[in-house]
From Swiss-Prot:
One of its GO terms (cellular component) is nucleus. InterPro entries: HATPase_C_sf (IPR036890). It comes from Arabidopsis thaliana (Mouse-ear cress). Keywords: Coiled coil, DNA damage, DNA repair, Nucleus. This is Structural maintenance of chromosomes flexible hinge domain-containing protein GMI1. It comes from the Eukaryota. Residues 1258-1301, 1565-1595 form a coiled coil. Residues 1191-1218 are annotated as: Disordered. Highly expressed in closed buds and open flowers. Expressed at low levels in roots, stems, cauline leaves and siliques. Expressed in the region of the shoot and floral meristems.
Amino acid sequence: MSSRRSVKRSLVLDDDDDEDIFYNFKVLLPNGTSVKLTLKNPEPEISMQSFVNLVKKEYDNARKDCLLMSKRMKVDWNSGGKFHLESNGGKMKGIVRFAAFKPDLCHIIRLDDGSGIASTMYENLWDLTPDTDLLKELPENYSFETALADLIDNSLQAVWPYREGARKLISVDISGDHITVFDTGRGMDSSEGNSIDKWGKIGASLHRSQKTGAIGGNPPYLKPYFGMFGYGGPYASMFLGRCDFSFCLPILICIVLLRLTLFSVRRTLVSSKTKESKKVFTLQFKKEALIDNRSIVGKNWKTDGGMRDPSEEEMKLSPHGSFTKVEIFESEFDISKIYQLQCRLKDIYFPYIQFCLATIFLCDELSKTGRTERPVAFQVNGEDLAEIAGGEVAITNLHSKGQFFSFQIRFTLFGGKRKGTAQEANARLKFVYFPIVQGKESIEKILQSLEEEGCKVSESFQTFGRVSLRRLGRLLPEVRWDSIPFMQRGNRASTLQKSCRRVKCFVDLDAGFSPTPSKTDLASQNPFSVALRNFGSKSTEKEKDDDVNIVIHREGKSVSYAHLEEKYQEWVLEMHNTHDEEAASGLDEAVLIVGSLDKKALGILRDAVRVHKEVRRKEKTWKRGQNIKILRGAYAGIHNNNVYATIDYFLIEGFEDEAGGDTRILCRPIDRPENEGCKLSIIDGISKLEVQSSLSLPITIIDSGKCLPVDANEWNRKLDKQQEKAPSKIDLLDERDCRELKIDGELPIGNSVRAGKAPPKQIVAVVRPACFTSLTPSKKLDQKNIVKMDGEEMVMVVKLKSSDKNISSQRLFPTSRKGISGLYIFSLGSKFPNLFKKAGTYNFSFSIGNSIKCNKTVVVRPSSKAARWELDDNLESLPCNVRVGSSLPPFRIACFDKYKNKIPFTSVPSLEVELEASPGFLIKIDKLETNLINDGLILKIENMLVETDELDQIRPNYEATLEIRAMDNPFSVSVPCKVNPGPLKRVAVNNPKALENLLPDSTVEDFILELFDGYNNHVAEGTDVLIHIDGYRIEDWMGINRKVDSRGCINLSGILKVTEGYGKSVSLSVMSGNEVIFCKESQIDERQLRLVTELPDCCTAGTNLMNLIFQVTELDGSLDTSIHHDEKSGCFHTMSIESDSSSVESAIRYAFVHGSCKVSSLSLPENEGVFSCRVFHSRYPELQMSIKIQVTSAPTSEREESGYSTPHSKTTPPPESGIPSITNPWPTPCSQFGVLAIRSSSLALSSETSLMDMAQYTEDLKEKINIDEERRVELEERLKCLQAQREHAEQECSRLQASLEPLGAPFPECLSTKESMMKQIEEKHHDTAASVFCCLYRKAPPPRSLFLSQKGMFGVVALLGSVASTSLSRVLSEYLGKDTMLSLVCKSSQFGPKSDEYRKFQSEAASLGRSITNRFLVICLDATRPWRNGLVRNDPQKRLAMDNPYLPNGDPIPGFKGYAVNMIDLASEELDIQSSSGYGLRETLFYGVFRELQVYETAEHLEAALPHINGGDAVSLDGVIARENGFIYSGCCTPEVHFPITVTERQEKALVQLEITRDKKRKTEEMMTEENRSLRRLVKKLKKANEKYQNFTAMADS
């Protein structure tokens, strides 16, 4: 024994070494009771009997304290060795070994007495006494579904942590009186950490500790850690079993649990098993047991429990060996509603039952594969909830459309209950669109479907909850928020606002949000709940909340609230435009209106609408003209009272095939007249809709029942009542009423007042009702007689009847004064103190809208006292222009008072009229007529003749002042005038001898024409004067069309050049209109060409006449030394000899030197006979003479010297022979100028008998070579000079072209004037009829209009008109072609080949030395088909009224510049040309050649416009020509003949200067060509002469 004890003692530590050891047991007794046994420091082993004795002792003590235990069956404690212990499936007999139990833990063991009777339920096994603080927050408003969901929450949280592959099952079985909730979670046992009593003990659940693990993560936050308070299980079972908790607890518990007294549970049994446990532990709520606990005096709340083996069915449902089963007995449930319960449970746990990618607004984040997944298997009465098709969530899914809109919000709370820590919560908001389809709202369809399934929701479209909350994936069923502020967008009844009502928000929350104890709603006072509920309010936008911080994320990025709001609105409108389908179908044909819509007034967003008069909605037909009643609250602005109105039209947005269009009702309120209603008009096929005073209401007011039809009786009653109170007229308060209101406000209506009377400071207008008939002054200010007119604006317009402008225009809203409302107080005298100073009738117009109007007049008469005279306003613009010799225009003088009001003259006053200017200029006008008109208001003065010869005193502006004075009072009128000289009547010459003793090519010096009018005044500066000259040329750009200078003269000094020859007559005349008023004829001095050398009577054939001297003399025989050839100074005087003999060549020129010309040698012919030749001046052929001489045959002779050879077969005589030599012994003056062309043949021997010394010949040849070398150097220098002149001309051309850049930039070669183009036609098209016409036209004397009428033709097409740019000139000229451009234009069609006009034209061409060899086109205006559709009004160019082309949508065609026929500019004389029928050039000629030719900016514009050009040609400014036949001509070329360019006067001067410079350049280039040719010939000649010289030198040396 001692050894055994020592062994046993070794298990017990000394008190000094360690603490005490306690073993706690709950012993289940055979009689169904249990006792608690605690052992301190027991032996490691004790006998079974000793252990039973300890149990018996505790049992006896318990019986004494509890009467219920004393009534139980007694335990046979004397069973001896039959007792054994059973713990978790293991048995212990004989000896109890404590090593099998862990100290400090409570172990449940069952004591078996060996009788074979074993109980499975034991009294008071579990202690469920709660913490009283937890009982303060028990749930309220429980329902059957929410209570059942509380039990399922526990099951879901139990099964969720299981690994993949383990069965996750929650099975609910419900019958009429029994409910079973079974799950395959980890289960419970009797262990301290997982004891089954925690399920039933309020606040003991371990699920609450897992809450923090469900904060954060990814939406939809599927972590079912729902535990919050720890009483979901017991409280739900109490509710479902209708338990009566009227048992005894401590006083605080009793007070708190009074709300639970309605529950009366019969029995609830909880059975649970863990995977490690072999036994199933049970816990039971039973009414009898709870009542029996009252004997415990409320210290403990205990309930029965037990331990048993698992059933076969339980192990089948949970193959892995763990489960929990809650059974509620004697429950009350209507089994016929089992389907609705299944649908409800599916709604609550939808994400945990199933999810797929298609369920876009729930759990799409969890679906990685796109297929439907089943996280947990839910069964209700054996039916899988995933296979149940009903439920609000499933039905909602079916009716949503389009993409969702989502974002996440992170809420952070600093402070709160836990100071110094930050709390966090997360929410994901998904917005789904439920469109209106075929006129029915999808939300209404959802409600209808729920009603059909028996799951009716007591909501309508208006009250439908548009926010659904899930916390950790579990629906909070009582959250049926109408919306959150973020979802409320747009003005009331706007498209955006209506579309937002079709959005539902699905909110997923994490565990950071706290629910109510019943988990049916969010805790209302929680800061996160408040922040979510108010998201989108102004406080959210401005972030004024100092506690909760909000961070928004969308698509993984942080976004601002403003950006989020913008994107949300865009999404809503996109969904509306894409998916909404209004079903308000019009029963009549729609009128389509595109654009020109007041979208704000109509409440629409689109640019196109369809207007109907009749639609069908809600199985009813609604028509235009139908009377309706709109109930208050139906629409913005309809708040306080119902509105009666008449339907005008129905408006549907968009085209027929477009979705998203809203339907609206346009109706006119009953208080608005018919003419202020909506107006639909169609003008020229264009529809227009004017809203005016009608209301635009959404069609949905019919759907909501807020719009009702009104029968005739109700309408008439309302109309009568409305008309009685309706505003009827506007009235002005009189002096008495204004005085009572303390307002200076009487308007002098009906009586006339004198100008200058002060107007009242204010006037008061009121609106009287229709029932107002009292004239009693005391009642005019009664409020019942004054309509308040709240919000109605009155307009007062003050206008003087004689003026088109408003004097004053004021707009006011009504105010109140002394308790009287509806007063419109307008400021008058305080704002316009000078109002009544102008005489006339003042019209005061008062109006409210277009229905209530009032007009009052005030007559103001002018003052009776005259103050001044003034010219009447009807005069034309000043200063007044008058010519000497004519009368001034009539003057109208009015008399005015001091307020500038016109008053009548009492009589015709005596007048003094003078024209005054600078000192010394005064013209009295005595000839005039005066009379009074317009009832004496106007003094008319007329026929004032102006005559004077003193205008030169006030030139050049001719400004003067006309003074009209009254002789009997101090009134006068001054009129600025401009007295211009009369027309040209006389011409004087400053130097009459300037046109005497004229010589050819001389320039007239000191020759000035003075031009006078008929009163001997110099004519005005700038006057156009036509000078006709014959034999002269004016050498400047102005030519014969001259302008008078500032002195009244035309200076021709130095520019008038003689062009005729010696002895010819010349003339100069000045034209005034068609009259010649000055003519000066002169004769050029005569000269004679004489031969000074005496000729022999006869000469031998083949010899030379030597040293012939010719002179130019005057008639008296004196030598004219001015005839001198000087090429450098431009004086060319040479002589030519012409003969029929081939031996004399006319190409030789002989130079005159101071009047004499010497011919050193003139070869005679080889044949005998009479030799004759004509000698003449090369430039003046009238200086000529003829030479005749007899030529005889030469006798035969021998050589006088033999052995002397000559370079030729012929010899020349030696110098001493006395025979004339052909050589010139001295250099002729001609050689100095390079004019005399000495040919090589001139060195030949003139006779076979002539002999020449070889040395002399060689010397002469050398001298000739030197002369030619000098000439070559001179030619090269001259070429350099010409080159410089050409370069200067090119630079000048470039400068002038730059100044004309806008005109000639594209094609400067087309930059020309009419004169230059005429000259070009004349020169380059020599054999054409157009060239002949231009030549005749240029030579015709003025006026040329007379020439045109005589010829019966108007000109050439190319010269009739001009264009604005060179690019337009080029393309139009190329379009017409050269033949058309050179066509002659005549009036009559009689200009045929056999007509007199044609033959006359041909004869005139022959007289010019021209022949018309080419065919030419004649266009007859009378024969063309003119344009007959009218001209553009008030257009000085008389353009054709042609409609511009348009695109099919009505827009103008891009790049269109105009019609070619209208782009031709016509001069004034061309505008006067008409056919016999009165049609002008544009209507006949140009319309005939161009028709409807269209001009475009570029080829791209032309190509784009081709499909829209019907039956016509088109061109572009860059050169493309498109013909009607489909041919398109591209490329670029410059036509030979083109239209001149339209230029200003300044541009014309530059253009003329450009033409002169071009001509100089052209002449310089021609001279350079000629000089180069001469240089080449001279170089060739020098080469041959040098070769000869070398040969002769060699012969002489030999």
